[in-house]
């Protein structure tokens, strides 16, 4: 009898301990999810982030839901984030190397592959800006437009174009999707791999003409080419540079500094966001904090389905597939999204993932 009573006592105590420990963990995670500690540093629950694959798969999950109605800018937090990022990088300076940084014939090491080197060609040097393309520039509102299929049928085109400065990623097509993505492009990125994927590697005159036409639509916009990241895209960069010079295109070319990507990663790691390599979208948001008073994000949705279970394309303009939760991916997009969602809820930025209000 005494043995049975002892077992019951141990069992009861164990259950109580489990119950209180679970409540303590839940409170801690809830606190960490939205906590800004110290002088504005973002802190996220690692356990919540690491289980994001399971979370997003739950039907009707509310983890990533947020409201755009009633959203208000938190100007003091915006200034705090800008100040903190400036401790790691100055986007005005690091957005591009300038002519005085190199001379033709200089040899540099690739940012993500220090064993490999690149020679600074005459064409590349001639296209380097004299001064930073973002020098002394400041905007009231900016749009950073990602390429997720969540934009399709959003009707966000007019809203995106209404911003003072629009940043786009990877030379994404806009004209045929204007109702959803707009057409205004003030700053647009272009990974060298785009040449092969979207323009056939310039194999024929038709491919080259298509590319030239796309760039001609940019006028005086900044074309941001990460030419120094890894070996393999150098010939594409040279082809692009040659076409710009040959056709006297008016785009303003920019090539990010050799320290930029490590500085951006350092900022987020210090703020307890364990990214691998920042995605283009996160990179652009980080840069935009330097010259934008209010940042609006569109086309950010790193999941194969929306919250209603409807399939969402990786890119709104093609059928490319992407494994968001693969450990082989160089990015941690779901983690990045969760971070941006926290910032949205605190008024540091506005994240739009649904339909836009008619203007």
UniProtKB/Swiss-Prot annotation:
<feature type="glycosylation site" description="N-linked (GlcNAc...) asparagine">
    <location>
        <position position="219"/>
    </location>
</feature>
<feature type="binding site">
    <location>
        <position position="279"/>
    </location>
    <ligand>
        <name>CMP-N-acetyl-beta-neuraminate</name>
    </ligand>
</feature>
<feature type="glycosylation site" description="N-linked (GlcNAc...) asparagine">
    <location>
        <position position="119"/>
    </location>
</feature>
<dbReference type="GO" id="GO:0003828">
    <property type="term" value="F:alpha-N-acetylneuraminate alpha-2,8-sialyltransferase activity"/>
</dbReference>
<comment type="function">
    <text>Catalyzes the transfer of a sialic acid from a CMP-linked sialic acid donor onto a terminal alpha-2,3-, alpha-2,6-, or alpha-2,8-linked sialic acid of an N-linked glycan protein acceptor through alpha-2,8-linkages. Therefore, participates in polysialic acid synthesis on various sialylated N-acetyllactosaminyl oligosaccharides, including NCAM1 N-glycans, FETUB N-glycans and AHSG. It is noteworthy that alpha-2,3-linked sialic acid is apparently a better acceptor than alpha-2,6-linked sialic acid.</text>
</comment>
<comment type="similarity">
    <text>Belongs to the glycosyltransferase 29 family.</text>
</comment>
<dbReference type="GO" id="GO:0006486">
    <property type="term" value="P:protein glycosylation"/>
</dbReference>
<keyword id="KW-0812">Transmembrane</keyword>
<keyword id="KW-0808">Transferase</keyword>
<feature type="binding site">
    <location>
        <position position="301"/>
    </location>
    <ligand>
        <name>CMP-N-acetyl-beta-neuraminate</name>
    </ligand>
</feature>
<feature type="binding site">
    <location>
        <position position="281"/>
    </location>
    <ligand>
        <name>CMP-N-acetyl-beta-neuraminate</name>
    </ligand>
</feature>
<feature type="glycosylation site" description="N-linked (GlcNAc...) asparagine">
    <location>
        <position position="204"/>
    </location>
</feature>
<dbReference type="GO" id="GO:0005576">
    <property type="term" value="C:extracellular region"/>
</dbReference>
<keyword id="KW-0325">Glycoprotein</keyword>
<feature type="binding site">
    <location>
        <position position="170"/>
    </location>
    <ligand>
        <name>CMP-N-acetyl-beta-neuraminate</name>
    </ligand>
</feature>
<protein>
    <recommendedName>
        <fullName>CMP-N-acetylneuraminate-poly-alpha-2,8-sialyltransferase</fullName>
        <ecNumber>2.4.3.-</ecNumber>
    </recommendedName>
</protein>
<feature type="disulfide bond">
    <location>
        <begin position="156"/>
        <end position="356"/>
    </location>
</feature>
<dbReference type="Pfam" id="PF00777">
    <property type="entry name" value="Glyco_transf_29"/>
</dbReference>
<dbReference type="GO" id="GO:0009311">
    <property type="term" value="P:oligosaccharide metabolic process"/>
</dbReference>
<feature type="disulfide bond">
    <location>
        <begin position="142"/>
        <end position="292"/>
    </location>
</feature>
<dbReference type="GO" id="GO:0008373">
    <property type="term" value="F:sialyltransferase activity"/>
</dbReference>
<feature type="binding site">
    <location>
        <position position="147"/>
    </location>
    <ligand>
        <name>CMP-N-acetyl-beta-neuraminate</name>
    </ligand>
</feature>
<comment type="pathway">
    <text>Protein modification; protein glycosylation.</text>
</comment>
<feature type="topological domain" description="Cytoplasmic">
    <location>
        <begin position="1"/>
        <end position="7"/>
    </location>
</feature>
<dbReference type="InterPro" id="IPR050943">
    <property type="entry name" value="Glycosyltr_29_Sialyltrsf"/>
</dbReference>
<feature type="glycosylation site" description="N-linked (GlcNAc...) asparagine">
    <location>
        <position position="50"/>
    </location>
</feature>
<feature type="active site" description="Proton donor/acceptor">
    <location>
        <position position="331"/>
    </location>
</feature>
<keyword id="KW-0333">Golgi apparatus</keyword>
<keyword id="KW-0328">Glycosyltransferase</keyword>
<keyword id="KW-0472">Membrane</keyword>
<feature type="transmembrane region" description="Helical; Signal-anchor for type II membrane protein">
    <location>
        <begin position="8"/>
        <end position="20"/>
    </location>
</feature>
<keyword id="KW-1133">Transmembrane helix</keyword>
<dbReference type="InterPro" id="IPR038578">
    <property type="entry name" value="GT29-like_sf"/>
</dbReference>
<keyword id="KW-0964">Secreted</keyword>
<keyword id="KW-0735">Signal-anchor</keyword>
<keyword id="KW-1015">Disulfide bond</keyword>
<dbReference type="InterPro" id="IPR001675">
    <property type="entry name" value="Glyco_trans_29"/>
</dbReference>
<dbReference type="GO" id="GO:0006491">
    <property type="term" value="P:N-glycan processing"/>
</dbReference>
<dbReference type="InterPro" id="IPR012163">
    <property type="entry name" value="Sialyl_trans"/>
</dbReference>
<feature type="topological domain" description="Lumenal">
    <location>
        <begin position="21"/>
        <end position="359"/>
    </location>
</feature>
<dbReference type="GO" id="GO:0097503">
    <property type="term" value="P:sialylation"/>
</dbReference>
<feature type="binding site">
    <location>
        <position position="280"/>
    </location>
    <ligand>
        <name>CMP-N-acetyl-beta-neuraminate</name>
    </ligand>
</feature>
